[in-house]
């Protein structure tokens, strides 16, 4: 009895082009190949080839960032809180779905940091991981009862015990602030700081409220 081999369905040329363009955008913002593979249907070999062609080098080895605790430490928390607030805006107000909201949010963050001659504390891969942590119920945006700002916290953290890192910065930060002028927060955003005077945050350029 003659048998015929089943052939895989032909891949759409339009889908292939769309995935390739998305992969290029992701890699351009610094996404590691594992992130790209999770967002597109391109083969691993093609993703890695694109990465090498676009960056001129091999991707970093090792696992993706996996610590949710890192996002609630002082400086990362300020950056993460802003990024997540922009991401929420992109989804709810701009109507951007999924990875498009992540891409546009990170572009806003990166452009602002560049305009202030500062480096991005949070890489695109870390931001992508942050969004996954929130979607998985590990982290969330919580409102500080002191200033009304919204900050990244562990999910289901009792709000009665939560005070943001701007209202109650670590002691080492308070000592540093006494030695510095508070010019870094002269234009701190109402979306983050609420109605109280800003606390100096070295290394983080403040952004206008969205």
Curated annotation (Swiss-Prot):
GO terms for biological process: bacterial-type flagellum organization; positive regulation of DNA-templated transcription; regulation of bacterial-type flagellum assembly. HAMAP family: FhlC. Transmembrane segments: none annotated. Keywords: Activator, Bacterial flagellum biogenesis, Cytoplasm, DNA-binding, Metal-binding, Transcription, Transcription regulation, Zinc. The keyword Magnesium does not apply. It comes from the Bacteria. The lineage of its organism: Bacteria, Pseudomonadati, Pseudomonadota, Betaproteobacteria, Burkholderiales. It is found in: Cytoplasm. Its cofactor is Zn(2+). Its main location: cytoplasm. Belongs to the FlhC family. Signal peptide: none annotated. The keyword Cytoplasm applies. Zn(2+) binds at residues 144, 147, 164, 167. InterPro entries: FlhC. This is Flagellar transcriptional regulator FlhC.
């Amino acid at each position: 009895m003659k048998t015929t081999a089943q052939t895989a369905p032909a891949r759409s040329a339009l889908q292939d082009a769309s995935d390739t363009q998305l992969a290029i955008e992701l890699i351009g913002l610094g996404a590691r190949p594992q992130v790209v593979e999770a967002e597109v249907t391109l083969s691993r070999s093609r993703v890695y080839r694109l990465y090498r062609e676009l960056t001129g080098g091999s991707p970093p080895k090792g696992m993706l960032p996996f610590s949710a605790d890192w996002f609630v430490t002082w400086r990362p928390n300020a950056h993460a809180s802003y990024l997540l607030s922009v991401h929420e805006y992109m989804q709810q107000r701009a109507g951007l779905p999924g990875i498009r909201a992540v891409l546009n949010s990170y572009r806003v963050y990166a452009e602002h940091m560049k305009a202030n001659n500062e480096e991005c504390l949070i890489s695109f891969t870390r931001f992508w991981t942050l969004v996954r942590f929130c979607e998985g119920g590990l982290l969330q945006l919580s409102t500080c009862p002191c200033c009304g700002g919204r900050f990244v916290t562990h999910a289901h953290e009792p709000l009665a015990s939560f005070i943001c890192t701007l209202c109650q910065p670590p002691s080492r930060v308070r000592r540093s602030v006494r030695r510095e002028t508070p010019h870094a927060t002269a234009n701190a955003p109402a979306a983050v700081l609420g109605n109280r005077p800003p606390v100096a945050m070295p290394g983080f350029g403040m952004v206008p409220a969205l």
